[in-house]
C-alpha cells in the first residue's frame, strides 16, 4: 500500500503541475476514456444533489472543456497554484483504486493580491491503463461558500 500511495502522490503532483502550467493537453491525459469529472459543492455532494458547476462524462467532454477554454472563453489572465496534501488510499477492489486528497488552489490575477480561490478534497476512483494510473472518476468537492472570480482552469 505504501508503494501505491507514493505512486498516487506522484500522480497528484503531476496533475497539479499540468494545471499550474496550463498544459491542458496533459490534463486530458490523466483520465480514462469512460471518465467522470465533476466540480461540486460540499453541500450538494453531502445531500446527494446532482447539480455540479462542471460535469464531464467521458474523455470527449473533457476535451470539449479544453477547447472551450482555448477557443471561446474570455477571462482575465491569472496564475494558479494547486497544492495537494493528505493523499490516502481508501481501498482497492476489482482493479479500481479508491483514493482521496485535500486541495487548495491559490489564484493571482494580474492586478490583485493572491487569494485562495478554492479549497476542498478530491474523491477519486482510478484504474490502471497499461502502466499508468488514470482517473476513472474525479469528484472535486469544494468547501467554498461561493466562487470568488470565475472557474476557468480545471480543479
Model-identified regions with their sequence ranges:
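Hydrophobic pocket/interface hotspot
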Residues: 15, 27, 62, 99, ...
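Short helix-to-loop capping/linker segments positioned immediately adjacent to catalytic or ligand/cofactor-binding
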Residues: 15-17, 70-77, 110-111
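A solvent-exposed, acidic/Ser-Thr-rich amphipathic alpha-helical stretch
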Residues: 33-102
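A beta-strand edge to alpha-helix "cap/lid" segment located at domain peripheries
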Residues: 79-83, 88-155
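Short, low-complexity N-terminal intrinsically disordered segments enriched in polar/charged residues
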Residues: 1-33, 40
Amino acid at each position: 500500500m505504501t508503494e501505491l500511495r507514493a505512486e498516487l502522490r506522484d500522480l497528484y503532483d503531476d496533475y497539479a503541475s499540468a494545471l499550474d502550467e496550463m498544459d491542458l493537453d496533459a490534463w486530458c491525459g490523466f483520465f480514462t476514456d469512460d471518465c467522470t469529472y465533476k466540480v461540486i459543492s460540499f453541500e450538494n455532494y453531502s445531500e446527494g444533489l446532482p447539480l455540479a458547476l462542471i460535469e464531464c462524462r467521458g474523455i470527449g467532454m473533457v476535451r470539449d472543456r479544453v477547447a472551450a477554454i482555448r477557443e471561446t472563453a474570455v477571462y482575465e489572465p491569472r496564475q494558479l497554484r494547486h497544492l495537494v496534501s493528505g493523499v490516502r488510499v481508501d481501498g482497492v477492489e476489482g482493479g479500481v483504486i479508491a483514493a482521496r486528497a485535500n486541495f487548495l488552489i491559490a489564484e493571482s490575477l494580474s492586478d490583485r493580491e493572491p487569494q485562495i480561490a478554492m479549497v476542498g478534497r478530491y474523491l477519486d476512483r482510478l484504474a490502471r491503463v497499461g502502466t499508468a494510473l488514470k482517473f476513472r472518476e474525479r469528484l472535486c468537492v469544494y468547501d467554498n461558500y461561493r466562487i470568488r472570480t470565475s472557474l476557468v482552469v480545471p480543479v
